[in-house]
Amino acid sequence: VLAICRGLQVMNVFLGGTLWPDVSQGGFDGGLHRDGEGGEPPVGDIAHWTEMEGSEFEVTSHHHQGVRELGRDLEVLSKSSDGMIEAVKHKSLPWFAVQWHPERTEEGLGRALPREWLRKELQRCTTK
């Protein structure tokens, strides 16, 4: 499963997590998460997961809700500079989710993310 934006939120709630009804309630900078032109670079382990150089990438982020409590068996891969969870993966299932829209990012992580996810899943399936 590759979940995007609301898909991350649905996955999190399905696994028992909770959401901030509005990111401003959690003390997050709402402006960082409503940028339609390319948003705040996430920080964290997303670069390691994709095997790309660097640890910060510009992403297109436009949401007013976000993960408050992480669902069971989810692991945080990336957070924005204000601490909002931006990417997660399931610890044992082939589930990966991002809060931003990689399809709206023309280069860098936007192009690499779907390709790397598919490559890792094909590798996982063929080694079993």
Feature-to-residue mapping (PLM):
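Hydrophobic/aromatic beta-strand patches that form the interior of the parallel beta-sheet core
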Residues: L2, T60, L77, F96-V98
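Generic low-polarity alpha-helical segments
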Residues: L2-I4, P42, T50, P94, ...
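Catalytic nucleophile loop
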Residues: V1-T18, H101
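Acyltransferase
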Residues: V98-K128
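Pocket-forming structural segment of enzyme catalytic cores
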Residues: L15-A87, K91, E103, G108
